[in-house]
Amino acid sequence: DHRDLHSFPTRRSSDLHHQLKFIHLAGTNGKGSTAAFILSILRATGLKVGLYSSPHLVRFNERIRVNGVPIADEKIVEYMKLFSADIRRIESTFFETTSAMAFWYFKQKKVDVAVIETGLGGRLDSTNVIEPKIAVITPISMDHSDLLGNELKSIAREKAGIIKEKTPVISSHQENAVKNVLVQKAAEEDASLMFVDS
């Protein structure tokens, strides 16, 4: 049951998508380590960097971080007070609500760049309302086949959904079936695509 990507709360935060600079990550394996690597490079240049990732290991707050510091409990409470009526009204999912909270928090903290991991797939993921400066795709393998399909090609098509028009894409080495899907999607979007060895 896929929902409209532009429903609240992501739609309510839509103005933020144009005010923040994003790096968008999708893939089956290695998203967390890749995000950490990107983060360390950006922070080494003096930039203020947000990270939205899932799942958390101990506390929910770990999902939303700025320069490695998790969002404070008080900020989570503030967000829920502001938007709880809308969240209940349209029965926003957990991940939609959390994604919108991350965008809102990164805007408040005035981050220079926000690194955003998809939670499930890519094409219909609630993070896919953003217009990233660059898309990064880690190795794709069988993943959430009950929701994304039971063939590698169908899963690759879902993950490739983060490729946007004229947006540079960097992908790790992929199996041929996956590579073909990414090449086709990049061509459709007139996006430059580069494969790198992991």
Where do the language-model regions lie?
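Buried hydrophobic positions in well-ordered alpha/beta secondary-structure cores of metabolic enzymes
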Residues: 25-28, 32, 49, 99, ...
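Short, small-residue-biased leader/transition segments that mark boundaries at the very start
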Residues: 1-2, 6-13
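ATP-dependent carboxylate-amine ligase catalytic core
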Residues: 15-18, 44-130, 146-148, 176
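Acidic, Mg2+-coordinating active-site environments of NTP-dependent enzymes
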Residues: 110-117, 132-198
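Aromatic/hydrophobic pocket-lining residues that form π-stacking "cages" and hydrophobic walls in ligand
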Residues: 38, 102, 182
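Glycine- and other small-residue-rich loops at beta-strand/loop junctions that grip anionic moieties
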Residues: 27, 95, 171-174
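Walker A (P-loop) phosphate-binding motif
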Residues: 11-57, 134-136
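Hydrophobic (often cysteine-bearing) scaffold residues that line and stabilize catalytic clefts
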Residues: 5, 34, 95, 178
